[in-house]
């Protein structure tokens, strides 16, 4: 229904509608869906590609799910030949559903340092049929790391980082927030947890959305599209992310689209934006602390840097409004305030020529 409405409203270029008229049309639609729609309306690429493979991701309300498995046994399963079978319980159209799924652990760092293991989920076609998973049968499930006080706020901050990137670039991984009832099945007893998490779509689905392909080999960052590479470097600077490498595809994928190589990031937990306690004192491969905000990128034409800088300045209000939508979702006000201060510091740098040149432009390799 929403899809057809957007088709009528936006895809004919000769039709111009004022914002208030669109809002009247959408006033019965939940706020987060309206926000998603307006993001799509601002980009032809977003509008054309968001609705491919979207039965799970078009609805941005948190999806309630239930999982039961042994976290300890899952940690032993690290490849597709040793999948753990269980059931996924969820609610679809106000009805309780369950499907068979296969799980394996993912993420080297988190498997070593976290209580909750990140999960890759695979669903057989026959099991996913007639469910919201029919178009997305391979997914990443992101869970909190530790069972500590900040676990849900940390995962929410990481989720928000994905939503910021949706504003910044049309090339992104779709996400869906989750409310998870998880039972850790141990030998002697069972332990139950109520967690916040989210699904990330599979990279093959991203490629299909753009009628493109994922590049798996190592490629020099200088061979990648100038604007999209610098755009990603600015985003990583915004969230304080130094735990990535486009060349080695560490916490990122490369999309070959219209003869351009475009980097797409994921995994934003070890960042200054989230600042999890389990990251304190740990350094990355470059020797940077995960608490530091450092610009990592290669030198490009000054015009590219100026274009990206203006891009972020233009989007400032939209980013701020999007982030503020999630304020009521935080369990602790301090977590939200620290995140907003971190975002504010980024724009203080971007809006100050001296700071911008010394902390961004001069740091390019």
Language model features: what each stretch is:
Residues 48-365:
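Phosphate/dinucleotide-binding and metal-coordinating scaffold of catalytic cores
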């Amino acid at each position: 229904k929403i899809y057809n409405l957007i088709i009528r409203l936006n895809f004919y270029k000769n039709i111009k509608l004022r914002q208030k008229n669109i809002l009247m049309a959408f006033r019965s639609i939940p706020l987060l869906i309206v926000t998603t729609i307006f993001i799509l309306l601002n980009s032809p690429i977003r509008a054309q590609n968001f609705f491919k493979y979207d039965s799970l991701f078009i609805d941005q309300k948190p999806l309630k799910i239930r999982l039961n498995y042994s976290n300890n046994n899952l940690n032993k399963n690290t490849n597709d030949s040793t999948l753990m079978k269980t059931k996924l319980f969820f609610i679809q159209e106000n009805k309780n559903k369950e499907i068979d799924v296969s799980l394996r652990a993912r993420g080297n760092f988190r498997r070593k340092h976290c209580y909750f293991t990140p999960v890759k989920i695979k669903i057989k076609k026959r099991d996913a049929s007639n469910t919201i998973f029919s178009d997305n049968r391979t997914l990443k499930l992101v869970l909190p790391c530790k069972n500590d006080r900040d676990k849900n706020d940390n995962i929410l901050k990481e989720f928000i980082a994905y939503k910021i990137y949706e504003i910044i670039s049309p090339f992104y991984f779709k996400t869906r927030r989750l409310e998870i009832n998880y039972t850790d099945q141990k030998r002697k007893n069972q332990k139950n947890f109520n967690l916040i998490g989210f699904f990330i779509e599979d990279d093959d689905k991203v490629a299909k959305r753009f009628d493109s392909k994922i590049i798996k080999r190592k490629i020099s960052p200088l061979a990648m599209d100038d604007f999209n590479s610098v755009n990603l470097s600015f985003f990583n600077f915004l969230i304080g992310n130094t735990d990535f490498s486009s060349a080695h595809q560490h916490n990122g994928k490369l999309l070959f689209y219209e003869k351009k190589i475009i980097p797409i990031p994921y995994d934003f937990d070890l960042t200054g934006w989230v600042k999890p306690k389990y990251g304190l004192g740990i350094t990355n491969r470059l020797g940077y602390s995960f608490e530091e905000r450092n610009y990592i990128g290669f030198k490009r034409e000054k015009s590219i840097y100026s274009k990206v800088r203006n891009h972020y300045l233009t989007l400032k209000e939209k980013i701020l409004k999007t982030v503020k939508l999630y304020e009521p979702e935080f369990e602790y006000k301090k977590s939200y305030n620290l995140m907003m201060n971190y975002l504010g510091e980024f724009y203080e740098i971007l809006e100050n020529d001296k700071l911008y040149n010394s902390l961004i432009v001069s740091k390019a390799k």
